[in-house]
């Protein structure tokens, strides 16, 4: 009889896609530790499936525009509406069809997860651009115009020129690239 430690190691070394094939082998094992382990991995698999469904929905616009446009860039900002601090925008072009688990609006992700995602995005992206407008600039031109400015700088910072921008619910003035506002 395999030890619980060995069974756990088997699941840890297997790919998520292989877990369903492993479950029947251990479902009849009456040891509480094995049943707890099976429940943990079933829950992990369910969580993974839900994440894949969420990511699939996120790619809705890529699927919609992917045949017409070969280089699609997502752009978003952080810091809009601050009392102090800059507004920062990021523009990212990912390879078609690429999904990154945990990718979400920065406000919905922990600081630690943002750092992990940043590293993975930098590693896998076709191109990444960053733009910023300082607090002084925000005071000078207002937060909305400073946001547009940061977004323009982010697009200008890209190594590759996109042919479509997917923006966070805005149309950025003075950018001669087709834009689609998403919410």
Residue ranges: model-predicted function:
Residues 1-73, 83-88, 92-183:
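Acidic (Asp/Glu) carboxylate-rich active-site/surface patches
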């Amino acid at each position: 009889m395999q030890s619980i430690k060995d069974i756990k190691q088997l699941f840890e070394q297997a790919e998520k896609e292989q877990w369903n094939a492993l479950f029947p082998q251990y479902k009849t094992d009456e040891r509480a530790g094995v049943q707890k382990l099976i429940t943990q991995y079933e829950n992990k698999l369910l969580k993974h499936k839900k994440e894949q469904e969420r990511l699939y929905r996120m790619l809705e616009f890529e699927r919609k525009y992917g045949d017409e446009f070969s280089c699609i860039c997502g752009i978003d900002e952080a810091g809009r509406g601050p009392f102090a601090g800059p507004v920062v925008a990021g523009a990212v072009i990912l390879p078609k069809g690429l999904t990154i688990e945990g990718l979400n609006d920065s406000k919905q992700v922990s600081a630690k997860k943002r750092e992990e995602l940043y590293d993975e995005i930098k590693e896998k992206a076709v191109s990444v651009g960053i733009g910023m407008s300082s607090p002084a600039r925000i005071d000078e031109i207002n937060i909305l115009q400073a946001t547009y400015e940061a977004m323009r700088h982010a697009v200008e910072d890209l190594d590759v020129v996109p042919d479509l921008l997917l923006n966070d619910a805005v149309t950025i003035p003075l950018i001669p690239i087709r834009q689609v506002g998403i919410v």
